[in-house]
Amino acid sequence: MIGGKFNLGSLMKNAKKIQEMMQKAQDELAKIRVTGESGAGMVKLTMTAQHEVVEMNLDDELLKESKEVIEDLIKAALNDANQKILKITQEKMMSAGSLFGGNESDNEET
């Protein structure tokens, strides 16, 4: 409040700016692809940051394994890709969220 009055115009301007930055971050995420791997590279899959699998490769040697082994390695590759997406998403949103006064370096992993 300035001089006892609430500055709605300033608040709306800041909200619009934050909304635009968040939309920009989401648009950037839509273009990102990550590759999850497991079994020393025997399973590789590529996903968008929106969790859509766009490619999967299985090493021919893996096909000699049991169904359970193959399923476990596919799950592990999916989990690997999801963890990468989560990290990237958090970084992008923190960057956009810095408008709230947060310091994005406070949450970086070392």
Curated annotation (Swiss-Prot):
Assembly information from the UniProt record: Homodimer.
UniProt name for this protein: Nucleoid-associated protein CBU_0656
The keyword DNA-binding is annotated on this UniProt entry: yes
Similarity comment text for this entry: Belongs to the YbaB/EbfC family.
Function: Binds to DNA and alters its conformation. May be involved in regulation of gene expression, nucleoid organization and DNA protection.
Key word DNA-binding present: yes
A GO MF label: DNA binding
Any single Gene Ontology cellular-component annotation: bacterial nucleoid
Predominant location: cytoplasm
NCBIfam families associated with the record: DNA_YbaB_EbfC
Pfam families the UniProt entry points to: YbaB_DNA_bd
Keywords attached to this entry: Cytoplasm, DNA-binding
Compartment(s) of residence: Cytoplasm, Nucleoid
InterPro entries attached to this UniProt entry: YbaB-like_sf, YbaB/EbfC
